[in-house]
Amino acid sequence: DLMLQPQDLGYPAPLGKNLWHIGSDEMLKYAEMILQKQHPLLQHVQQPMFVYVLTMKEHGPYHTDTPNHFNLVKDGLSQKTIACLNDYTQRIVALNQATETFHHSLKQRNTPYVFAYFGDHQVAFDNCLPPKLGQYANPDYVTQVVVRSNVPSSFTQQQTFVDLAFVGGLLLEIAGLPVEDEFMRANIAMRILSEGKLEDAEDQSLVNDYRHYL
């Protein structure tokens, strides 16, 4: 395993610099550099690489003076909240553009890839928490998971809901890679048994047994 900071790949800042404002397009540019092994510690790597990238630009706080670019109107929302929502939305638009550009670069490499991305947690605008939909155990942490790949696979999605704790096994299956340890075998089996749920599973005794087994 190897942990690289953006500064290790050319970002002009000291290692102790706060990176909350680094753009997601920049972060994905550094991910491309890692895949191209543009770092001395990567040049000997021959096996497939698993690269995890954390983007930060989408995180709050959000600016309360952002113009209403998206013409948002809703009863009960203050002007500050609408401004924050516009700021958040424009950051998500930029993230989407960066994501599509990165995915295009993956396709151009003509090598097998599995590209997955997911959100972190629900947002608060001007200290206003939007109402949550659905009966979830932790509604503030409901997000989306997207997987895109050029690897031929017989994998079919069985669950309409999946806990992020099961994404590792999901990616192994989609990539067609062998599951070589008991932890990941249990991870995949539990995802199937619990229909992708963990905290939200109806059978919490099964969840407790799974955790005890791990």
Where are these regions (language model features)?
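Solvent-exposed soluble domains appended to multi-pass membrane proteins
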Residues: D1-L214
